[in-house]
């Protein structure tokens, strides 16, 4: 795509595809701060074939947007609901990596029994964002520095989450820990092991934030112990005791869901991770059966972008009830400092014009869950 410049994004819609009229209408919009969007609406009836949802009021399924994209490696696309929309189907927030070359699918949640959408019923925004390749700066677990004498032995038979009880007893009384409990269903999903160093015994925490590959938009968030999310319920997951340090530049960290889990009816409430706090996010189970996320699963992803990149995602968005009541919709930010927007280049020769990528058309869990 070098012929169009380093900020060019190649786009093919089903309407620009040769000899095809397409099911979707797409319009380009530039929002506050130079943020570029595609605003899409279905102009024909769209079939909806949800996955088995059991005893649930909701049906979850994928809908093709008839859209393919090729972005520079420092860009990603966010699939989300528009700022203003009616009480119809819910479009779950999704993240598209720069290396994805397949047709973009939106995860849609609708009342159980829905099998299609009338023309104009589905409205989807695609927002293009600059992203940062630098991982966030985290503290060590508090126990390493403040409580080395309290490192729990894996064989001590202690409570399942000894570090999340809010206090541990010492010879001098109770000592408060910075890990916060949000409601009764917070689950610490990290892994702590006792290690011996030249400075004495301390606790090591297994990495919860995996290195980012070149074409990835976000850093995968890993859990080290199984977590069960109840049927039609929600669980708050804290993957690590590490605290986010204040960024030196205009950056913010956002916790977003994974497409593969969204499509199974497991929705991560998008949340901005504020500095000075440990990471925590809500997983909502819209199915009628309990779902267990196995140890070693990638359950969310961490996106590092500009402070004003996603202003409509609230910080510390911990709500254990009403997956949609507080689910954020896109809101343009009119106060951000303007910057040079990317250039959208529409083509009907996508396969010939798009540069090759390692990921190709693999998506929805193709890189592991």
From Swiss-Prot:
Reaction equation(s) it catalyzes: dUTP + H2O = dUMP + diphosphate + H(+)
Coiled coil feature spans: none
An MF annotation (GO) of this entry: metal ion binding
Binding site for substrate: 258-260, 364-365
Enzyme type, top EC level: hydrolase
Alphabetized UniProt keyword annotations: Hydrolase, Magnesium, Metal-binding, Nucleotide metabolism
Cofactor entry: Mg(2+)
Parts of the chain that traverse the membrane: none
A Gene Ontology biological process term: dUTP metabolic process
Protein EC: 3.6.1.23
Gene3D superfamilies in the cross-refs: 2.70.40.10
Summary of the function given for this chain in its UniProt record: Involved in nucleotide metabolism: produces dUMP, the immediate precursor of thymidine nucleotides and decreases the intracellular concentration of dUTP to avoid uracil incorporation into viral DNA.
Protein family: Belongs to the dUTPase family.
HAMAP family cross-referenced by the UniProt entry: HSV_DUT
Name this protein carries in UniProt: Deoxyuridine 5'-triphosphate nucleotidohydrolase
Species name: Human herpesvirus 2 (strain HG52) (HHV-2)
């Amino acid at each position: 795509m070098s012929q169009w410049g380093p900020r060019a994004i190649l786009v093919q819609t089903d309407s620009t595809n040769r000899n095809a009229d397409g099911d979707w209408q797409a319009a380009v919009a530039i929002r506050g701060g130079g943020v570029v969007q595609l605003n899409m609406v279905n102009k024909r009836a769209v079939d909806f074939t949800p996955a088995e949802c059991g005893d649930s009021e909701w049906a979850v399924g994928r809908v093709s947007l008839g859209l393919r994209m090729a972005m520079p490696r420092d860009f990603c696309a966010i699939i989300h609901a528009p700022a203003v929309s009616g009480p119809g189907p819910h479009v779950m927030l999704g993240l598209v990596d720069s290396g994805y070359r397949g047709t973009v699918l939106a995860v849609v949640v609708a009342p159980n029994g829905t099998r299609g959408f009338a023309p104009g019923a589905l409205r989807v925004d695609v927002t293009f964002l600059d992203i940062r390749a630098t991982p966030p700066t985290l503290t060590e677990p508090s126990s390493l520095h403040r409580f080395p004498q309290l490192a729990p032995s894996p064989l001590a038979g202690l409570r399942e989450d000894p570090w999340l009880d809010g206090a541990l007893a010492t010879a001098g009384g109770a000592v408060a820990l910075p890990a916060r409990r949000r409601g009764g269903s917070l689950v610490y999903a990290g892994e702590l092991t006792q290690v011996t160093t030249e400075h004495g015994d301390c606790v090591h925490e297994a990495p919860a934030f995996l290195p980012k590959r070149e074409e990835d938009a976000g850093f995968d968030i890993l859990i080290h112990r199984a977590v069960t999310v109840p049927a039609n319920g929600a669980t708050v997951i804290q993957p690590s005791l590490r605290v986010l340090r204040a960024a030196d530049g205009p950056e913010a960290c956002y916790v977003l869901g994974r497409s593969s889990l969204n499509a199974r009816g497991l929705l991560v409430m998008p949340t901005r991770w504020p500095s000075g706090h440990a990471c925590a996010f809500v997983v909502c189970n819209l199915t009628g059966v309990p779902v267990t996320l196995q140890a070693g699963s990638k359950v969310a992803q961490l996106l590092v972008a500009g402070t004003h990149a996603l202003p409509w995602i609230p910080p510390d968005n911990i709500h254990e009830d009403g997956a949609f009541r507080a689910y954020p919709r896109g809101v343009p930010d009119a106060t951000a400092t303007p910057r040079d927007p990317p250039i959208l280049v529409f083509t009907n020769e996508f396969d010939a014009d798009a540069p090759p990528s390692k990921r190709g058309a693999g998506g929805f869990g193709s890189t592991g869950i």
